[in-house]
């Protein structure tokens, strides 16, 4: 199976510096959900700093951690981890020829996205964001998880403030 990301690709996309060579089969921003081979992106949140969980993510099998603070272990140092995640999402979209479908609205986004995914997955390689990952963190995270050979990408976009859909649609 071809890796989702290599250290060289992520270095290029994020303009970061990797401490070692690695391959990643997934991307995560939550150390509690790390799967072996994931790339962990240490985001700064309103209540937690992902950098506090880098050691935990690596001990659970993360291939590397994207950080903007120096940490021990397999890391890729960038200027801003949120911008790095956005860059990964944009790069994932550029490297595929997938038809991208965005689902927005007040009610029924997740169900509609899942129904479209179900129908299209019968025809070709289809990727959709998991659950309701539809905000400024979830959309670039979901895009960064999209395999290069995807034919259809279905993404839910939500908003908490005016103009948010516009910025998410630019991803």
Language-model-detected regions and their locations in the chain:
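Phosphate-binding loop of NTP-binding sites
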Residues: 8, 84-171
């Amino acid at each position: 199976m071809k890796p989702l990301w290599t250290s060289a690709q992520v270095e290029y996309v994020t303009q970061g510096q990797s401490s070692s060579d690695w391959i990643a089969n997934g991307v995560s921003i939550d150390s509690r959900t790390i799967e072996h081979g994931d790339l962990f992106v240490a985001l700064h949140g309103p209540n937690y700093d992902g950098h506090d969980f880098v050691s935990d993510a690596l001990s659970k099998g993360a291939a590397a951690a994207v950080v903007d603070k120096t940490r021990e272990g397999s890391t890729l140092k960038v200027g801003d981890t949120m911008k790095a995640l956005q860059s990964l999402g944009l790069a994932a979209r550029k490297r595929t020829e997938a038809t991208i479908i965005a689902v927005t609205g007040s009610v029924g986004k997740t169900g509609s996205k899942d129904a479209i995914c179900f129908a299209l997955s019968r025809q070709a390689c289809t990727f959709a964001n998991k659950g309701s990952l539809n905000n400024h963190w979830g959309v670039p995270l979901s895009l960064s998880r999209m395999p290069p050979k995807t034919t259809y990408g279905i993404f839910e976009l939500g908003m908490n403030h005016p103009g948010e859909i516009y910025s998410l649609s630019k991803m």
